[in-house]
Amino acid sequence: MSVPDYMQCAEDHQTLLVVVQAVGIVSEENFFRIYKRICSVSQLSVRDTQRALFIRYRHHYPPENNEWGDFQTHRKVVGLITITDCFSPKDWPQTFEKFHVQKEIYGSTLYDSRLFVFGLQGDVAEQPRPDVAFYPNYDDCDSVEKRIEDFIESLFIVLESKRLDRATDKSGDKIPLLCVPFEKKDFVGLDTDSRHYKKRCQGRMRKHVGDLCLQAGMLQDALVHYHMSVELLRSVNDFLWLGAALEGLCSASVIYHYPGGTGGKTGARRLQGSSLPSEAANRHRPGAQEVLIDPGALTTNGINPDTSTEIGRAKNCLSPEDIIDKYKEAISYYSKYKNAGVIELEACVKAVRVLAIQKRGMEASEFLQNAVYINLRQLSEEEKIQRYSILSELYELIGFHRKSAFFKRVAAMQCVAPSIAEPGWRACYKLLLETLPGYSLSLDPKDFSKGTHRGWAAVQMRLLHELVYASRRMGNPALSVRHLSFLLQTMLDFLSDQEKKDVTQSLENYTAKCPGTMEPITLPDGLTLPPVPFTKLPIVRCVKLLSLPTSLRPHKVKSLLGQSMSTKSPFIYSPIIAHNRGEERNKKIDFQWVQGDVCEVQLMVYNPMPFELRVENMGLLTSGVEFESLPAALSLPAESGLYPVTLVGVPQTTGMITVNGYHTTVFGVFSDCLLDNLPGLKTGGSTVEVIPALPRLQISTSLPRSARSLQPSAGDEIATNVSVQLYNGETQQLAVTLENIGLEPLEQLEVTSKLLTTKEKLYGDFLSWKLEETLAQFPLQPGKVATFTINIKAKLDFSCQENLLQDLSDDGISVSGFPLSSPFRQVVRPRVESRPTNPSEGSKTGDLGHVKTLEAVLNFKYSGGPGHVEGYYRNLSLGLHVEVEPSVFFTRVSTLPATSTRQCHLLLDVFNSTEHELTVCARNNSELVLHASECQRMAIQVDKFNFESVPESPGEKGHFANLKQLEEERQEARGLEISSKLDIRWRIPSLKRSGEASVEGLLNQLILEHLQLAPLQWDVLVDGQPCDCEVAAACQVGDPVRLEVRLTNRSPRSVGPFALTVVPFQDHQNGVHNYDLHDVISFVGSSTFYLDTVQPSGQSTCLGALLFLYTGDFFLNIRFHEDCKSKELPPSWVCLPSVHVRALGAQA
């Protein structure tokens, strides 16, 4: 026997071997259709008994193996079933003859045979024959299973007769010597009458009867016969047959202990109509006692039925541990015979299957190791493949997965051995795939993305290389690309630099013919190879969705309740909702993208390769919103470290969009890399809302861009920065061009400004504009342009604390509180030693050369299109950087009374801080020319001011923080009124630049009082004409002059009554006043005037007359009586103007 049956198991010893073969030409499909139906009848209960027969079918069985049928009866072919096609009665004789020829091959051992004929109809088919069955076709053959059952019953009858015949021990009969084929020549010439010979014959026959009993379903009888055989054969040292007896004993015990079988069959081999005893669960108990049943208890029909019904009472079978020991002993006996190599190998296989059931892997591996070294005849390549495959399956059965994979790989390599004319690359590839689990490999790259690497990387890489080569030899380049991609993705950390270069070069060569895709590859056997995305080429460590640029970010119009209010809940705050939505906040981002705008996602990538990595067609993978990804191409330097990469795309619709990953093309392999499959990835969320489309506004100005960027508060960003240099007081126009560069109409525009500089005091409107004409052009369609003008007025403090002119003794008040000179001009150069030496003081008000900076932000809030309907808008900020150089300074300011009580002189010391000649002028005054760094004093005659009072209602007072702030507001309002009336302007002719100068901030409370018109207004009229000192009232000598004094009360309270006396005098212009004018002037009536009490906003008038007797210039001084109510009022309230009267001679 040279062909081992690697599928043998211990329970096969109880089966009857039936060969099913085709006679003539029968299609393989039809043959196996009937063969499968025949195999379905593998177990049959014997009528009127509790025994069962088990059948083992084979469609191919070497005839030489049949010669070992006496040694082990399950190897004997006892039944033959042939299948043939016969469509004509003429062919029937020839077909039947072939059937007989086939029977002759196994004729010495056959119990019975059957012939199934398909296609023959007519008289021949209608003749009843016990060994032939006729069927019209392969579809109309319902009785096949019934025929097989009848056939098995006939086999049982023959089997039972042979068992009874061999089991009957007739004294005096000579027992034949059963032999194996190679023993026949060894027994020629032996003494057949010796006691040793007879014991040999008895022992072998007893073992043979045990085999028949086991096949006939009499387990306990078989155990008894095997025990008796062992004793007999052991006494004569018949080792080969002793091994067979021990193996039979082991097989019977295995059948008893493991009713489910050891060969992995699905159904348990049990007696039909019977149940296992309750002690079956304890059959595996170690050390079960062996008690031999008295052979006298045996009958021709087997053991007494009473004992046969409860097998558990019989302790003849071996314990699980003893089974293995007996197997080892039997195999040791087999190993003594070279020609019993197949028997030894199959015994090892059977023992391994038993040990696998007992979960004793280490002992099973010893049997397998022994099987590996059993020398058989020279095996064919196909037999070698079969042997290694079975060894692999057995190692897998006992849990030695890597050992199993090793032999599976050896079998795969054997399929393409050089000695094979036509290498079986497909079989090799299939076997290599089956080895993957044993080497901790799978075809899914996800299994390698988490945790530490499992298995030996070097062996795994070798196996993957072999898969690549085998798939290439199969002519399937797509498979080669898939396996090579898997190798590069999963084994990247274990490849040397040279290996990385070699693998990528090979991959590029393969993908040049067949690019790698993300489509699963389904093999003919149904196995699916999942796609292999290159998540390590490059490695992505961080994914961050970027907000739109500041100028393009959408903002939601705040509702009346505020942004923080939720319309989904009536509660102001609910911690439960906040807790439940924690995970959602981690995924959703707090900014929005806009439909139709280019949106960005930043990836931090790393190139692990030792050479430059070219990544082509890299784009985003999204869901939820229609998204147009704009692919990018990268070139990462070798081992680049973290490298920022920005991927962009345009959402085409609105809704929630989720960034699921990215796609790349590397080395010709297209990859879809999902974020969920990236290990160690940091992301701040991947879901963002896309709102409806909004217009895009682009701003350009007439000013140059600024190199300095403004840093506004609250995280705002400036889209564009412009700068301009102005002199203090100068105004410049900024032309702003608005262009709609988007796809939606611009429907709404609001412009606001915000001053960033707070340390400098600004006077007036720094920025001003008018939008009416611009808004009249709205809606501004895409591509259209609109313009408007912004006025920039840099008006800072013009005061300076430096004393640049000599102090003169007069009654004026300076800014610093020192007396000033009279209103004639005095010119002086600035004294260097008077400059402050402390650097901190240099930045204060009054630093003559300090350039001050003003920064402001113009904010353009605009909206339009679908986004405007949904309540969204955009902000575009323009940063304005203004450097203000000093123009003129007012180093001192004071006042001098004028000849009129309603006027005064404002004295200003003006300093030119520029490097150019500068002119200064006030309203109705001539220009004052100042050279560079020159200071001059200018006097401006001004009418006194009737300042409007700041309201003092309780609500108005509450608007200010305190009374001091209230007073400051009043003072600023008065300063603004004074500046507007003075209208002081400067001009630099050489630069053609001009501006205004303001006295706001210069005037203290004392000066304001001097400039303020008294609440009591005194008017003196001479002959009905208002009179003031500057203009002399003319009259004729001898004519009475009517004098009228009028009082207007503008104070909030009533005043008076008053008594006034008119005192005339003459001024000799030498400091001498002559009051003795009784002979020159005569009063018509009294020289004292009386005024009654005047109510608020009321008026009172008193009249008198004078008579001038001589010509000349006379002055009338109107005084209050000392006991008058005037003492209760401030002096400025009771200051009456002087009257200048010129008496002329009578005209002829």
From Swiss-Prot:
- Check the record and name the InterPro entries matching this protein: TRAPP_II_complex_Trs120
Subcellular localization is given as: Golgi apparatus, cis-Golgi network; Endoplasmic reticulum; Cytoplasm
Determine the domain of life of the protein's source.
Eukaryota
Q: Where does the entry say this protein is expressed, by tissue?
A: Expressed in neurons of the pyramidal layer of the cortex, in spinal cord motor neurons and white matter neurons (at protein level).
Q: Which residues form the signal peptide?
A: none
Question: Where, if anywhere, are coiled coils annotated?
Answer: none
Q: Which residues carry this modification: Phosphoserine?
A: 566, 953
Subunit info here reads: Component of the multisubunit TRAPP (transport protein particle) complex, which includes at least TRAPPC2, TRAPPC2L, TRAPPC3, TRAPPC3L, TRAPPC4, TRAPPC5, TRAPPC8, TRAPPC9, TRAPPC10, TRAPPC11 and TRAPPC12. Directly interacts with IKBKB and MAP3K14.
* Family, per entry: Belongs to the NIBP family.
Functional description taken from the UniProt entry: Functions as an activator of NF-kappa-B through increased phosphorylation of the IKK complex. May function in neuronal cells differentiation. May play a role in vesicular transport from endoplasmic reticulum to Golgi.
Instruction: Indicate what this protein is called per its UniProt record.
Output: Trafficking protein particle complex subunit 9
